[in-house]
Regions:
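Active-site nucleophile elbow and catalytic-triad environment of alpha/beta-hydrolase enzymes
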Residues: 174-190
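Conserved alpha/beta-hydrolase "acid-adjacent" motif
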Residues: 207-212
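Catalytic active-site module of serine/aspartate enzymes centered on a nucleophile-bearing elbow/loop
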Residues: 230-256
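Active-site loop/oxyanion-hole signature of alpha/beta-hydrolase fold enzymes
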Residues: 77, 87-120
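Short beta-strand/loop motif that positions the catalytic acidic residue
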Residues: 194, 200-202
């Protein structure tokens, strides 16, 4: 009669059991894809990656989601579901004859609703920061948190004087530049209406005045301003590994 070899049996079955356990621990909700969505009468290209609480990334004027690829990847790996959107008429989207921040804010608001996102956090760089602030002013209670880098809420007096003088008087027929010369048109009172925790940043050598950054952050009830030492408008943001740790620390501090 053949004697059953328990030792050999368990040696052969243990790797199978361990493999099954490991598979059960994998986060099957992790996603990575790109798509285009129609909102507010325009098509928006976006890249999505991760699993967990939603974070929306908004690039600067004339840029694309690719500018934020590093922070996108780092946040996804840290446990967030990240959506990097190409703003209307920019990146992979068809160009448009004119642009307004309020339209872009509505675009992102409708994106949030279409995707069924519950109080997402938004990080916006430059124009993207303007859009994030404008969104929460227009649609209060939509966002769970705001972080901005190099944002401004109005034009005159928000930029370093040597840049502002030449920029605002420069003749142009470029629609995106025309928008920046005339918008945004938000106010300090608008900032006081923002209810979500907000981190308002600019670089020490930014085009945006440090005093303007402080004006925004200090007038949002749950806001804070931070000037990033040694950095310019986008050096700590555009495909830089420096931004994600700042955002993750902010999200942790506010319980997001």
């Amino acid at each position: 009669m053949h004697k059953f070899n328990y030792r050999s049996f368990f040696r052969s079955i243990i790797p199978v059991i361990l493999a099954a356990v490991m598979c059960s621990c994998v986060n099957h909700s992790y996603q990575s894809y790109t798509d285009t969505i129609k909102v507010n009468g325009v098509s928006l290209f976006y890249a999505a990656e991760g699993a967990g609480k939603p974070v929306i990334l908004l690039h600067g004027n004339g840029g694309s989601h690719n500018d934020l690829e590093t922070v996108h990847r780092q946040l996804a790996q840290a446990g967030y579901m990240v959506y990097a959107i190409d703003s209307r008429g920019q990146g992979a989207n068809p160009r448009l004859p004119e642009y307004h921040y309020k339209d872009m804010a509505t675009d992102v608001y409708e994106f949030i609703k279409a995707k069924g996102l519950e109080k997402p956090a938004v990080f916006g760089f430059s124009d993207g920061g303007n859009i994030a602030l404008q969104l929460e002013v227009m649609y209060p209670g939509t966002l769970g948190a705001i972080a901005t880098g190099g944002a401004n809420i109005f034009v005159h007096g928000s930029l370093v004087p040597e840049f502002e003088q030449g920029f605002l008087t420069q003749p142009t027929d470029e629609p995106l530049v025309i928008m920046m010369q005339n918008e945004p048109t938000m106010t300090v009172e608008d900032m006081k209406s923002i209810g979500c925790p907000s981190l308002i940043m600019s670089g020490e050598n930014d085009l945006i005045l440090a005093d303007h950054t402080r004006l925004i952050g200090e007038n949002i009830p749950s806001g804070e301003a931070r000037i990033i030492s040694g950095e310019d408008h986008g050096s700590y943001i555009c495909n830089s590994p420096k931004l994600a740790p700042i955002l993750i620390d902010f999200f942790n501090r506010i319980g997001y």
